[in-house]
Amino acid sequence: MSSSSAASIGPPQPPPPPAPPEEEKKCLNSELWHACAGPLVCLPTVGTRVVYFPQGHSEQVAASTNKEVEGHIPNYPNLPAQLICQLHDVTMHADVETDEVYAQMTLQPLNPQEQNDAYLPAEMGIMSKQPTNYFCKTLTASDTSTHGGFSVPRRAAERVFPPLDFTQQPPAQELIARDIHDIEWKFRHIFRGQPKRHLLTTGWSVFVSAKRLVAGDSVLFIWNEKNQLLLGIRRASRPQTVMPSSVLSSDSMHIGLLAAAAHAAATNSRFTIFYNPRASPSEFVIPLSKYIKAVFHTRISVGMRFRMLFETEESSVRRYMGTITEVSDADPVRWPSSYWRSVKVGWDESTAGERPPRVSLWEIEPLTTFPMYPSLFPLRVKHPWYSGVASLHDDSNALMWLRGVAGEGGFQSLNFQSPGIGSWGQQRLHPSLLSSDHDQYQAVVAAAAASQSGGYLKQQFLHLQQPMQSPQEHCNLNPLLQQQILQQASQQQIINPDAQNIQTMLSPSAIQQQLQQLQQMQQVQNDQKQKIQPDQSYQVPTSAVLPSPTSLPSHLREKFGFSDPNANSSSFITSSSSDNMLDSSFLQGSSKAVDLSRFNQPVASEQQQQQAWKQKFMGSQSVSFGGSVLHNSPTSKDGSVENKIGRDVQNQSLFSPQVDSSSLLYNMVPNLTSNVSDGNLSTIPSGSTYLQNAMYGCLDDSSGLLQNTGENDPATRTFVKVYKSGSVGRSLDITRFSNYAELREELGQMFGIKGQLDDPDRSGWQLVFVDRENDVLLLGDDPWESFVNSVWYIKILSPEDVHKMGKQGNDPRYLS
């Protein structure tokens, strides 16, 4: 050859690499070959070490011939279950008749001495070079009809095909596409019909007939970097009705591949194999580095959860979830101690019948190995960051993180992700919440439960709510409201199991007496001159007869304002709030008043309480206080109540102190998104993302603080926030898309990384999302509909972000 003669001229030079066959130069396009092979195909790099599995090679023969390995095929005891080989050559081919792609590999087993030599692992392999500008469509019956044409999706035609000239009527052009064998095919691309659509007409039926395409096969159109249109096909796997003659020699094929591998292992000679990615159930030539990582550096056990990539329709990829049920040899008789399909699994979804019952270690991704660290997301996590600081979700003591533990700084020591949140929280949270008064509150409750009168508690509530009262709101009580309260009270029953004091149903006469006392109290309260706007009126029905804390210590009685031991029963309290919702008076009063939950009196469900508090702080101006749902009732100019009390009160006790201060604060802080006056926002800079931190959850910027509750309700919101390091977060309407491929494409264009998100394994970029339970998951794990219903935020991780998270994997603060 010319290369050898050239090498003999001049000074000695290292011999050049052998030239590839001439037919490969003109026939195959690597990008098109990989696109036809599939998005999960990985060819090892020439010159690297690989692991060859004869057992997997036999599976490919069985799948190709539709005949399993029979027991009479001789076994080769000297052939190990896995051979460590040197990969000398990889050549891509395509069948001339069917266009099926396959690869030819030349392997050479390593002797024990070579296996012990120092070896620097190369990359995991050449991932499938999937094109960035392409579309794949499964053919329908009309697409394969000789009288019709090929219907192209609108977005696919606009993205892949050259633009049409819409000044023509109808718009049309001629397309020239090259297939895997470099043969040109001409099609007429036209935009017509009712409704109008993109069609390939002239030339399409010729292509279908020549390739013998049927419904279920797939075609791919690729617009490459050289501005060329490439065309490929994928045959649908279908059972063979007429067995080809090769079935008769299938046993010989099994024997032949085993004999060739055994001979090569014994003599350390080269041997050749063929890998068909569309027919083989799994890859049976694995890069050595990938094999070592999976076998020796991944811990698995029965019961462990995992995910696994599968190719879906139209060249998309999806992860399916499953559970490891057994770790054992797939064929302990013929292939003992083999890692091939050594993991028996159970799949989550009903489509598990299409998934293999056994997989190999390098095919799965245990959930514990993927780094999911909310430090990169401005989001709340479920578990505590420090071992001594309880989580916000810790129902046993949800205020622990505010008070600090074991000498730590508590609230001040938390490392907030958003600038300024620490100072904002310190300004708005009253110091009483940062102290350990829990035992003292318990003493108040215990003393009250042991007595017979509720006067002290009534006065305490009045004392706490005085800064929020308005004289104009106490003047008139709508007769309709009085009648409704009477009807509701006749259906209520207040029970105190802790103090063993049972109050029977209140009679109408008792309610009437309490209303009279209410009017007298309102007259007294009118004398209190306070400069508070009456724009937000929260009405609290409180007719519970609570015991009096006669045994309360004097210092506690003074601390909590129980100055009159002879105070009478409680009545109907009306208050308003125009001050800051997190003002010290409000939080101090709320924290002390609502801690009466130890009475365990029957109340509305927790869901009703949370919904009521959510409505108060997110725009509907209603509040759950003492277990009752209290709706804001706008007042007219004369002070009369215009609206009825909310329907949620009907099934609740008129006063039921069953709200825990911890749950109150938990439901209050994350939903502080609206109903805040302009004056209360003076300390919050415009355009800031103040509440984007791991404790409060991720709220939008200052404009989002004034949004309506309907826009922020998880059940109704369709816009999600997308974050990427170094870029401004953006909102995206998730309902615009119908699958993951469209979403990835849009995100790539939105952040200027087009094509990087289509193949995370090749590019290193990862897409993760946070669901409404604050779990961080890989995007693509769940069915599309489930993802749309559960997604809350999306995070784009660069390869640097993923690498950085891997280094922080042992830090408990980053565990989710």
UniProtKB/Swiss-Prot annotation:
GO terms for biological process: auxin-activated signaling pathway; regulation of DNA-templated transcription. CDD domains: B3_DNA. Residues 717-801 form the PB1 domain. SUPFAM superfamilies: CAD & PB1 domains, DNA-binding pseudobarrel domain. GO terms for molecular function: DNA binding. Residues 11-20 have a biased composition (Pro residues). Its main location: nucleus. It is found in: Nucleus. Pfam families: ARF_AD, AUX_IAA, B3. Auxin response factors (ARFs) are transcriptional factors that bind specifically to the DNA sequence 5'-TGTCTC-3' found in the auxin-responsive promoter elements (AuxREs). Belongs to the ARF family. Interactions between auxin response factors (ARFs) and Aux/IAA proteins occur through their C-terminal dimerization domains III and IV. Homodimers and heterodimers. This is Auxin response factor 12. It comes from Oryza sativa subsp. indica. The gene is ARF12.
